[in-house]
Swiss-Prot record:
<protein>
    <recommendedName>
        <fullName>Oligo-1,6-glucosidase</fullName>
        <ecNumber>3.2.1.10</ecNumber>
    </recommendedName>
</protein>
<feature type="active site" description="Nucleophile">
    <location>
        <position position="199"/>
    </location>
</feature>
<dbReference type="GO" id="GO:0009313">
    <property type="term" value="P:oligosaccharide catabolic process"/>
</dbReference>
<feature type="active site" description="Proton donor">
    <location>
        <position position="255"/>
    </location>
</feature>
<feature type="binding site">
    <location>
        <position position="29"/>
    </location>
    <ligand>
        <name>Ca(2+)</name>
    </ligand>
</feature>
<dbReference type="InterPro" id="IPR056300">
    <property type="entry name" value="SusG-like_C"/>
</dbReference>
<feature type="binding site">
    <location>
        <position position="25"/>
    </location>
    <ligand>
        <name>Ca(2+)</name>
    </ligand>
</feature>
<keyword id="KW-0326">Glycosidase</keyword>
<dbReference type="GO" id="GO:0005737">
    <property type="term" value="C:cytoplasm"/>
</dbReference>
<dbReference type="GO" id="GO:0046872">
    <property type="term" value="F:metal ion binding"/>
</dbReference>
<feature type="binding site">
    <location>
        <position position="23"/>
    </location>
    <ligand>
        <name>Ca(2+)</name>
    </ligand>
</feature>
<dbReference type="Pfam" id="PF00128">
    <property type="entry name" value="Alpha-amylase"/>
</dbReference>
<dbReference type="GO" id="GO:0004574">
    <property type="term" value="F:oligo-1,6-glucosidase activity"/>
</dbReference>
<dbReference type="Pfam" id="PF23915">
    <property type="entry name" value="SusG_C"/>
</dbReference>
<feature type="binding site">
    <location>
        <position position="21"/>
    </location>
    <ligand>
        <name>Ca(2+)</name>
    </ligand>
</feature>
<keyword id="KW-0378">Hydrolase</keyword>
<feature type="site" description="Transition state stabilizer">
    <location>
        <position position="329"/>
    </location>
</feature>
Length: 558
């Protein structure tokens, strides 16, 4: 396996709207990020993934782009962005931009032109179809509820939008679209960026004919089998690599809902020349029932272990894993798989240990390193996320479902859990802004904030810093093989990493109860060294350990 800088890096995702506001308008901005770079350097971050900062009407918080080569006014200017890149490079940090090219905003110039007439030169930049018998061209539903088709009076046709109606899908089968996208990518790469995270990139190739989904169900249904990992996806990614990516020393990760391990090998195998990593979602769907995301069910540790292990083993020799618990679309991990009450600190450290000792490139989401939690707003009016608001409208207003039950599912799964402002200190609005924040700060900011974390040497922040240092100083963490042990233990997640004669033993209690770890007999060693631990502990025998609630430890064995 080839050694690469992006395999050895730790990435930190910034959601700019909620990170730091420099001018008091209640919205995080680029100058706010610049002011916090030293904090991220102290943590040990190598790469910052910046969620979209391009010009946008903000229907989906910047994932609806109206100009790919301009900066959104709320975030600052291109000069601010240039300064951010310069300041990051001065600190030996790299910048990965968000590439959102499955769709644009309906306010993008391409779409404004495309709507005008059927023979406009931009018409085929998007996917237009006549209706069928007075209805939509097919029965596909949109991710944010309703139909995936929007009728447009101007030309008496419908356009496809897999997300909101203000996010029309680009027609990637049109070579001009692809070339314009590649030119835009080169614009940013020539400015000196170090990579792209690609939004729902496995949606860009739609099945020819856009077939109706065969189903007994009434209404709109997911058409994912007709656009996820579609017929030309590898052709287009290979072309993108050949024409753009391969000419720069950069890192790439493709967000790919529904991707399997076998498909991931095709996307990330080095000899295939497509992408370096994918974001897969299987471990993020384990607490969803048959009704999808909002149908919340408990996730057993056995299932979680089995799933993460499957990905570790599948990409052991081909491709590369991305490691994450959190991002801007997911609830907070300490509330989801940990214990955000009595054992918040212990369980946040335990979850970090399990993830960061695996093979792959770890991604930390803002606030994760201080153990930020989910939020419980009393009223739907305090929520801002289009997905949450549309779901509430559909379930409560249109179907009359129980408000309490719907709010409960929002508390557990809503995307705004990740989007409340970063908690910097215990001052007003957690030090995020001097104005009124665009979304309310989580009320627990007085107990959970960066200032307090930096003053306490036993904080979650310093634990993350130490995990990152372990990765930097031990090649085994980056390149060692992975093997699950105690696979049928319902309470303990334990695995072994091996690199030459070295071994790492990682042990984690996923419960609020004590439990006993027994070392499997086939693990032999002559020396043992404790590398990191989330309780006070002495070096001792490892054959039989009573683990306290959410206890985690890593040993080096020789």
């Amino acid at each position: 396996m080839e050694k690469q800088w992006w395999k050895e890096s730790v990435v930190y995702q910034i959601y700019p709207r909620s990170f730091m506001d420099s001018n008091g308008d209640g919205i995080g901005d680029l100058r706010g990020i610049i002011s916090k770079l030293d904090y991220l350097k102290e943590l040990g971050i190598d790469v910052i993934w910046l969620s979209p900062v391009y010009e946008s009407p903000n229907d989906d918080n910047g994932y609806d782009i109206s100009d790919y080569c301009k900066i959104m006014n709320e975030f600052g200017t291109m000069e601010d962005w240039d300064e951010l890149l310069h300041e990051m490079h001065e600190r030996n940090m790299k910048l990965m931009m968000d590439l959102v090219v499955n769709h644009t905003s309906d306010e993008h110039n391409w779409f404004i032109e495309s709507r005008k007439s059927k023979d406009n030169k931009y018409r085929d930049y998007y996917i237009w179809r006549p209706g069928k018998e007075g209805k939509e061209p097919n029965n596909w539903g949109a991710a944010f509820s309703g139909s995936a088709w929007q009728y447009d009076e101007m030309t008496d046709e419908y356009y496809l939008h897999l997300f909101s109606k203000k996010q029309p899908d680009l027609n990637w089968d049109n070579e001009k679209v692809r070339q314009d996208v590649y030119e835009m990518m080169k614009f940013w790469l020539e400015k000196g960026i170090d990579g792209f995270r690609m939004d729902v990139i496995n949606f860009i190739s739609k099945e020819e004919g856009l077939p109706t989904v065969e189903t007994e169900e009434e209404g709109y249904v997911s058409g994912h089998k007709h656009f996820m990992n579609g017929p030309n996806i590898h052709k287009y990614l290979h072309e993108m690599n050949e024409e753009v990516l391969s000419h720069y020393d950069i890192m790439t990760v493709g967000e790919m809902p529904g991707v399997t391990t076998e498909e991931a090998k095709l996307y990330t195998g080095e000899e295939r020349k497509e992408l370096q990593m994918v974001f897969q979602f299987e471990h993020m769907d384990l607490d969803s029932g048959e009704g999808g995301k909002w149908d919340v069910k408990p996730c057993s540790l056995l299932t979680l272990k089995e799933n993460l292990t499957k990905w570790q083993k599948a990409l052991e020799h081909t491709g590369w894993n991305s490691l994450y618990w959190n991002n801007h679309d997911q609830p907070r991990v300490v509330s989801r798989f940990g214990n955000d009450g009595m054992y918040r600190i212990e369980s946040a450290k335990m979850l970090a240990t399990v993830l960061h000792m695996m093979k792959g490139t770890p991604y930390i989401y803002q606030g994760e390193e201080i153990g930020m939690t989910n939020v419980r707003f009393e009223s739907i009016d305090e929520y801002r996320d289009i997905e949450t608001l549309n779901m509430y409208k559909e379930k409560v207003m249109e179907r009359g479902e129980d408000i309490e039950k719907v709010m409960q599912s929002i508390y557990i799964k809503g995307r705004d859990n990740a989007r409340t402002p970063m908690q910097w200190d215990d001052q007003n609005h957690a030090g995020f802004t001097t104005g009124e924040p665009w979304i309310t700060v989580n009320p627990n900011y007085k107990e959970i904030n960066v200032k307090q974390a930096i003053q306490n040497k036993d904080s979650i922040f310093y634990y993350y810093k130490k995990l990152i240092e372990l990765r930097k100083n031990n090649e085994i963490v980056v390149y060692g093989s992975y093997d699950l042990i105690l696979e049928n233990n319902p309470s303990i997640f334990a695995y072994v990493r091996t690199y030459g004669v070295e071994k790492l033993l990682v042990i984690a209690n996923f419960t609020a109860e004590e439990c006993i770890f027994e070392l499997p007999e086939d693990i032999s060693y002559s020396e043992v060294e404790l590398l990191i631990h989330n309780y006070d502990v002495e070096n001792g025998p490892i054959e039989n350990i009573t683990l306290r609630p959410y206890e985690a430890m890593v040993f080096k064995l020789k």
